[in-house]
Amino acid sequence: MNIIDELTWRGAVNQQTDEEGLKKLTDEKKIGLYAGIDPTGDSMHIGHLIPFMVLKRFQQAGHKPVILIGGGTGSIGDPSGKKSERVLQTMEQVHHNEEALKSQMVKFFGTDNFRMVNNYDWLSKMSLLDFLRDYGKLFNVNTMLAKDIVASRLEVGISFTEFTYQILQSIDFLHLYKNEDVQLQIGGGDQWGNITAGTDLIHRMEGQEAKVYGLTIPLLLKADGTKFGKSEGGNVWLDAEKTTPYEFYQFWLNQDDRDVVKFLKYFTFLSHEEIERLAETVKTAPEKREAQRRLAEEVTSFVHGDAAVEEAQHISAALFSGEVKDLTASEIEQGFKNMPSVDVENKKENIVLWLVDTTKIESSRRQAREDIQNGAIRINGEKVTDVNAEIDPASNFDGKFVIVRRGKKKYFLARVK
């Protein structure tokens, strides 16, 4: 199957500058293509993953992806999809973010048949006079104003800095066409104006016969109409320090039945046959959530590796069953990150006093005794029924944590100082 047909089946194509031309080109040869990301932060989130999943599919089909880190454009800000002016970052921030993004990209794309470039390398060498003389005359202001990317900002105002962003992105495409043999730019739906500005510039400077193309990806919406990419806690990051692999796994595991097949097509490399089989299980046995489980496994493995999948599944099973005593300290950090927690001293104490006075888990000594005697309290996975029992914070989990479960579902974490 042609790569464009494959992307279409997976729901990953929104607009193309020349569908038939691009299909013909990708049938004839392996092409260079690129997508860019500005270093506005030190980690990508799952929304950023969307265009790079498309690039990865091209790479797997033998094509040559180029990742553009926007060290130059990132220092001024892209108005795409923004209702107000971006806050400019210091160059130190930009360079720090560049290095973090590079390390993430290498994890996804490896080092073979893949290039990473930084537009700061060529944009920073261009003088203002060069910019105006060589490129400014080729851009019609009326055309630029008519593009959605700018028109949507005219009422609230847009600075000249952000207004010129589409020119800089066009220069990037031209540079990569001439120096990296790149013929296709990929971006989100809000990048259409910038991408077509780039193909127009190349045709003006290199001739209409230049074979360059643009392809945008649809805005991913969930079945409830909300934009895909965030959890209740905000962005779902690809950096394990910002969103733990367990949280990442749970995000995918909790996807709605109405969305899971779409996400399997988009975010996994499973075959058509396997996805269609999983789609059937959503209809016939939705309670088993096999499709969601496979989605969580595949995407977590791609971003964090197989070991992270096993760890996330171990944490999930322990929390569901209550058998937490076999968890490692690292797994507890992940699984209990968003649960109620309290700092405690590393000293032995009567369980009733510890639950009431030290941790405030129980509201009164009477309630604490009652819960203990009724078997409602578990410490580190073990049921405690003796009101005279002693808590030793250093006895489990490398002396770092005490896990309390009250009732069937209510967990608390005590962090040992």
From Swiss-Prot:
Main location: cytoplasm
Positions contributing to L-tyrosine binding: 34, 165, 169
Alphabetical keyword list: Aminoacyl-tRNA synthetase, ATP-binding, Cytoplasm, Ligase, Nucleotide-binding, Protein biosynthesis, RNA-binding
GO CC terms, sorted: cytosol
GO biological process: tyrosyl-tRNA aminoacylation
Function: Catalyzes the attachment of tyrosine to tRNA(Tyr) in a two-step reaction: tyrosine is first activated by ATP to form Tyr-AMP and then transferred to the acceptor end of tRNA(Tyr).
Identification of the protein by name: Tyrosine--tRNA ligase
Native species: Pediococcus pentosaceus (strain ATCC 25745 / CCUG 21536 / LMG 10740 / 183-1w)
Gene name per UniProt: tyrS
